[in-house]
Amino acid sequence: MAAIKAINSKAEVARAQAALAVNICAARGLQDVLRTNLGPKGTMKMLVSGAGDVKLTKDGNVLLHEMQIQHPTASLIAKVATAQDDITGDGTTSNVLIIGELLKQADLYISEGLHPRIIAEGFEIAKIKALEVLEQVKIKKEMKREIHLDVARTSLQTKVHPQLADVLTEAVVDSVLAIRRPNYPIDLFMVEIMEMKHKSETDTKLIKGLVLDHGARHPDMKKRVDDAFILTCNVSLEYEKTEVSSGFFYKTAEEKEKLVKAERKFIEDRVQKIIDLKDKVCAQSNKGFVVINQKGIDPFSLDALAKHGILALRRAKRRNMERLSLACGGVAVNSVEDLSVDCLGHAGLVYEYTLGEEKYTFIEDCINPRSVTLLVKGPNKHTLTQIKDAVRDGLRAIKNAIEDGCVVPGAGAVEVVIAEALVTYKHTIQGRARLGVQAFADALLIIPKVLAQNSGYDLQETLVKVQAEHSNSKQPVGIDLNTGEPMVAADAGVWDNYCVKKQLLHSCTVIATNILLVDEIMRAGMSSLKG
């Protein structure tokens, strides 16, 4: 009897073989759910929430976040896979598949009496060798636009259909190249992803500027301003109550009138300073003037600004204030005391767009914008959500490629190369640990196998062809998913991120090893004592 039973008679316990069987069963169950998602030919999953919301996706990260996984081991694997997505933006499905396959291959040897610790040692040796091979396979490239397009397309085609992937690829690459600055880290928060429920998903486009999800609040203000100066400010243009509890006392109606006028004058002076700046910079030209304020603007102030031909937007979101300065230039001001031309940004075109009851303000034609907007369009909510998830992964794929300074061949080529190298390397290892290396090599081949299977080809036949071609050509060979034939991934422009593969090898080995070495599962928390 398990020792825990003596302490707590209601505890549940699984030991030795039973514990391993439970864990391997959970890993393979999760693998079976996700295996049909892998690659550009993967199938969709429909997630229906408790409230009846429908989500169509084949993004492993979304699935693992949304699914309610109750099994503790499956939940652990899901957390590792979603952490991979948070760090590198890709490789979620591959992570689950490889962990499941490592445990499956290990199970074959354990059932023949091999101790899990020996397999774990073999896995560790294989991982170190696999990382060495990955270093040799990676291709250092000058990061030109064509390489970025190939990397983004490879990532996006696994998330959305090919026609949409082609549209998104151009937009995603141009947005990262626009915000990229030499010798600075790339900040993807400077790419605003704005959704608009309108037209079809292929109308998604890149705006070299900013889109705000609100419009002007005064009927007389211009709907379109060409060649505009932009003043971004965080100044209250309405009367605000004091922060401390205070009051004004008056004896007569005249005194009250004076107080009201003093309050009004306080705001009018601020507005007048903005109007004076507009008159100063636009006096000799037809240039427009736009004020974007983070705080409120009262109706009187709006009226005064409208009379002088100024387009004013109030209550802009805080995150957009930083983006405005980067997109249009200029400086966001917190006071109207020292306004000058240097504070102003510039945009070639500012216009308001009305869609149903929603209003949007487009700020376009900025010179060298360091912040841009991806305007995602789609007919319904779940299409928009799917595109946004894909765009985020595409952005991170390009960022990874730029930061790594290298790429690795995709389409299952890397896994085939590493597996071949491990089979050769196995003969140099003494003792039974070589079986762990063999198991690791066989497990990695799950990626090309599933890619072939999801594309409707015979997985064994396709894999044999690819391995034969690799042996003959000595180049990384992947699978052409349109024909099922081997192809040189580099020539076809199918590239994966180096950091994704590196992270994949590390995390899969660690988790698979940890799960293998579990020999007892106990459920003995306080909740199981009730009743």
From Swiss-Prot:
The UniProt record lists the keyword ATP-binding: yes
BP GO terms, sorted: protein folding
One cellular-component annotation, GO: chaperonin-containing T-complex
Domain of life: Eukaryota
GO molecular function: ATP binding; ATP hydrolysis activity; ATP-dependent protein folding chaperone; unfolded protein binding
Cross-referenced Gene3D superfamilies: GroEL, GroEL-like equatorial domain, TCP-1-like chaperonin intermediate domain
Cytoplasm listed as a keyword: yes
Annotated compartments: Cytoplasm
Keyword terms: ATP-binding, Chaperone, Cytoplasm, Nucleotide-binding
InterPro entries, alphabetized: Chap_CCT_zeta (IPR012722), Chaperone_TCP-1 (IPR017998), Chaperonin_TCP-1_CS (IPR002194), Cpn60/GroEL/TCP-1 (IPR002423), GroEL-like_apical_dom_sf (IPR027409), GROEL-like_equatorial_sf (IPR027413), TCP-1-like_intermed_sf (IPR027410), TCP-1_chaperonin (IPR053374)
Pfam families (UniProt xref): Cpn60_TCP1
Similarity comment: family membership: Belongs to the TCP-1 chaperonin family.
Known function: Component of the chaperonin-containing T-complex (TRiC), a molecular chaperone complex that assists the folding of proteins upon ATP hydrolysis.
Cited NCBIfam families: chap_CCT_zeta, thermosome_beta
Assembly information from the UniProt record: Component of the chaperonin-containing T-complex (TRiC), a heterooligomeric complex of about 850 to 900 kDa that forms two stacked rings, 12 to 16 nm in diameter.
Protein name: T-complex protein 1 subunit zeta-2
Provenance organism: Bos taurus
Designated gene of the protein: CCT6B
